[in-house]
Amino acid sequence: MRLERLNYNKIKIFLTFDDLSERGLTKEDLWRNAPKVQQLFRDMMQEANKELGFEADGPIAVEVFSLQAQGMVVIVTKEHQEADTDDEFRDEFIEMQVTLDESEHILYEFATLDDVINLSNRLYNLDVTGGKLYTWDGRFYLWMEEEEQIQLLKADFIAILAEYGNPSTATIYRLMEYGKELMASQAIEQIHNYFVKKQNLS
């Protein structure tokens, strides 16, 4: 489980499917308002309080995004509290919305260009050459369509990506509107040729 504060009243939690399995849950369970799902959110809120100082001291809205083989991203937003309550985790204060990403694309974000360069070296050596590269708000984003991943099993592909970056909940449309497209196609090959291959020749 990885936690990240997005702003003063919103956090992002990334759960792998192993995280769910350890708690006796499956992806499909998150579509049901079962007691063990409520317990999962209580555990997440306690962890968020401990790691980020994020206190769920009122009603919260929970958005769950399924990212294919990558896991689940949970966006928790603390909403305005109309009245005080002694029980900060009452079930009626949890508004849950689940969004299933049915598309076969993969979108990962990276903190630095070096992370993208190191990733491209790994993938190029495994005959993966495609992808689009964007930058937005100081971070880098790699978008891959399903047909660009066929050289690897998806689970293996995700495992390599996870060594260098994190799954992103941004959409390609947001990147197109607010970000800057650095490479429109064959991003892995271009990065490898420009940064890795050129460096090896020098």
Swiss-Prot record:
Record remark: domains: The N-terminal domain has binding sites for ComK and probably for unfolded/aggregated proteins; the C-terminal domain interacts with ClpC.
Taxonomic lineage per UniProt?
Answer: Bacteria, Bacillati, Bacillota, Bacilli, Bacillales
* Family, similarity comment: Belongs to the MecA family.
Protein transport: present as a keyword of the record?
no
- Coiled-coil zones: none
Self-association or partners: how does it assemble?
A: Homodimer.
Q: Name one GO biological process term.
A: establishment of competence for transformation
The protein's matches in InterPro entries, at most eight in alphabetical order, are given as: MecA_C_sf (IPR038471), Neg-reg_MecA (IPR008681)
Enumerate the GO terms in the molecular function aspect.
protein-macromolecule adaptor activity
Keyword tRNA-binding listed: no
- One matching Pfam family: MecA
Note the Gene3D superfamilies from the entry.
3.30.70.1950
Q: What are the annotated disulfide bridges?
A: none
Q: What is this protein called?
A: Adapter protein MecA 2
Q: Which domain of life is it from?
A: Bacteria
Keyword annotations of the record: Competence, Sporulation
Q: What does this protein do?
A: Enables the recognition and targeting of unfolded and aggregated proteins to the ClpC protease or to other proteins involved in proteolysis. Acts negatively in the development of competence by binding ComK and recruiting it to the ClpCP protease. When overexpressed, inhibits sporulation. Also involved in Spx degradation by ClpC.
- This chain's source organism reads Bacillus anthracis
